[in-house]
């Protein structure tokens, strides 16, 4: 049986980390693509030279021509400009929208049957634009946001409670930005909801609110510390979890920026919601009940994403 083919479009810090993780997990043969000739080839060669030490069998190649991604089973898109200190994800919109147009055309021509995971910021608007530019089925184009945001939330909760990260489940809904909605009510430690843990004296509402805010600021905290770029280890690990769910038909329940067609009262937008990912791509959108406060926060997040999509249409009217 032929190996799967994974195309990594963008060979920066996330792209290189994706290639290494995909190799370690033996998810398939890997093509690193970047318009900056030499970088994908160099990173591909470097990671390939680690394979005898790490003990994985995968072909790693680099390319600067879209023809190299032909027939890819999965495309993970990180191409674009990352954040720098003082920038919001939204500040990147104009530059990265043009990148999505080129990437969409490349995928449409060479990998129309791929499952496409977008990481480029501002995420919810970029994945929406990428789907339109590529013309791929909406269930086969998804944004990586909720897995990362939930992972940050889970880590901070594990540190607060001094328990294993494995015993914490957490959900973050909404856009991948300052308006994201970490849901305490649907987040648990070994099945015990966070509100119950407050009553049990494990933490306080004030402390939990601080953790929720730190989750919202998770990316900005790292940007501020690095000063020259943004997070890449955790975003790459999050996208690989999604790719693996698709390639191995795992039916994983993962929060992702998925295309909504009426769910949660949202139409023709990509917003972070719980989904089931299997061989069919996004196989199901899970609609959970939101209370009044949660619904208001979610609607505020949706409105922020809608504003970004409108800004995209102003720049590229063909998206309408």
UniProtKB/Swiss-Prot annotation:
Keywords: NAD, Oxidoreductase, Tricarboxylic acid cycle. Substrate binds at residues 83, 89, 121, 152. Its EC number is 1.1.1.37. The keyword NAD applies. The active site is at 176 (proton acceptor). It is an enzyme of class 1 (oxidoreductase). Catalyzes the reversible oxidation of malate to oxaloacetate. This is Malate dehydrogenase. The lineage of its organism: Bacteria, Pseudomonadati, Pseudomonadota, Alphaproteobacteria, Hyphomicrobiales.
